[in-house]
Each structure stands twice: as C-alpha cells, then as structure tokens.
Amino acid sequence: MKQLFSLLCFLLAATGIWADGHGPVFGLATPTNSKGEWSFDTGLFGRANDLGSEASLRALVGYGFTPHVSLFLTAPAVIGDLRLSPTRIQSGSDFEATVKWRFQHRATKVGTRIESTLFAGVAAPGPQSGFDDLVVTHAPGTMFGAVTGMASRSHYLWLGATFTKFYEHSGSKRPDVLDYSLVYGYRPARWRRSADRWDWRVFAELVGEHSDRFLETGSPVPQTQAHQLFLGPSLLGIYRNYTISFGAQASIYQGLGSLYPKERVRFAANFSYLLFQHSH
C-alpha cells in the first residue's frame, strides 16, 4: 500500500504526463474530441481489498475526426497481482480501441446543452490479466455502450452504460461485463475562471459493474460471478490545454462469488494535454 501511495504522489507531482480531461474519472460522459484535436493521456486506477492494493497505469491517445466522432487507443500496465473481480472501468488490464459518436448535441438555452454519445470498441486482455487457478483465455471482446445527459455552466448530469462481450477460445472464456454509471457535477460560480487560471468542478459518481462467470473447459466456474456498486467524489481542474482529475469511491453494495475477496476502495488520478483544441 505504501508503494502505491508513493507512486500516486509521484504522478501528482510530475509534469508532461496526461490523462482523460473531458469529464469524471470513474463514470461515463458525453464529450468527444473536437475536429483535429489530439488528446494525450496518462491515468492511474487503483483497487483495494482486504489483501492489499492493485493499480493499473494507462496511456491513452485520442483524435477527433469531426466535432462529434473520435477514436481512442488505450494501453495499460498493472502493478500488483490481487484476485479481483473483472472490471472495465478505465480498461483495467485490457488494451482497447474505441470510437465515440456524439449523435445528439442540442442547445436548449444559452450555456446549456443536451448531448448523447454512442461507444463501440474492441478490448484485448493484456498479459497481466490472468487469474490464479483458472485457465484464462486472452481472446478479445467487443464493447458497445451509450451515455446521455445535460451540461450547463453550473451543472452536469450523465447516465450511461457499456456492455463488453468476450469470446470463447478452446473452451475458456472471460466473463462478459456490464458497467453503468450516474454522474452529477457542480461548478460553483466562485470556481469559474478564465482560460489562464485553474477552473474547477466537483462530481458525485455512482458506478456499478455486473459480470457473469468464467468459462473453463466449456463449463461455468462456480462462484466467479460479481455485481458491485461504488460511490464517491471526484474533482476536475482545467488550465488552458491541461487538465487534472482525481477521486475515490467506496463500496456500497457487493454481490460477489466466494472466489473474490471483498473490494473496499477504488481511487483514480488522470492527467491530460489537449493539442489543437477547439470548442465542442
């Protein structure tokens, strides 16, 4: 735990590293990159249970082909080797390519807009995505999802879900994962700043994950199903083309198979640099 805390402090102090600066750190949101905008991201996503902690470092590159269509590529590296339920929050230990299409972008009044975004992608389990005592395939999966919501100068509200289906290989299969989230954000008037000063907003994030059982030699593995809910705050700060966000969540519901220790806390820190930024 001390090593993970030291690593987090190092990342918070570092310069020249990036993360996803478009919204909350755990839940889904509608923003995409602007046309011609590159985003360069680095993030830390951690999980802790009764046996210790594990963290996933990720690098992400995004590009906006149009004001509403973006492509994102993610590569992770895992620190630790705990037995934890499957997760698709911030890709976990999976390599991923995702296309986002913001198909609804409607202004209802000055400073307020309604948006909806669709997701489609491919996930490939990395070399660190194994599971003790099980024959786990690294066959890829496909992901589809959607998120909708409202954004104004002061308030944000997003509701969304994604479903990732992994494919069977030689009788083995990883669990399919459904994740869903509800996010509320608030940007107080006193926190609003011009582009040359830090501009902050706070989020309350509710995230749920449901996964079915592993498949081994063609048969479901007992006690490997999972359903969890997490709730917690996060902060997002924007300064010119740089953003920083961080947060933590506590478990509020756990329906886990006996193969998994109870997960207590999740934490995340994200850093982002946006190049050729345009308005959304």
Model-derived regions: residue spans:
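Transmembrane beta-strands of outer-membrane beta-barrel proteins
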Residues: W38-T42, L71-L73, A97, T112-A120, ...
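Short loop/turn motifs that connect adjacent beta-strands in outer-membrane beta-barrel proteins
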Residues: A29-G36, L51, H68, Q104-E115, ...
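Solvent-exposed loop/turn segments connecting transmembrane beta-strands
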Residues: D20, R47-A55, I79-Q90, H169-P175, ...
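Residues that define the transmembrane beta-barrel architecture of outer-membrane proteins
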Residues: S53-L57, Q90-F95, I114, V136-T142, ...
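Outer membrane beta-barrel transmembrane domains
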Residues: L182-H280
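Outer-membrane pore/translocation modules
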Residues: I79-P175, F271-H280
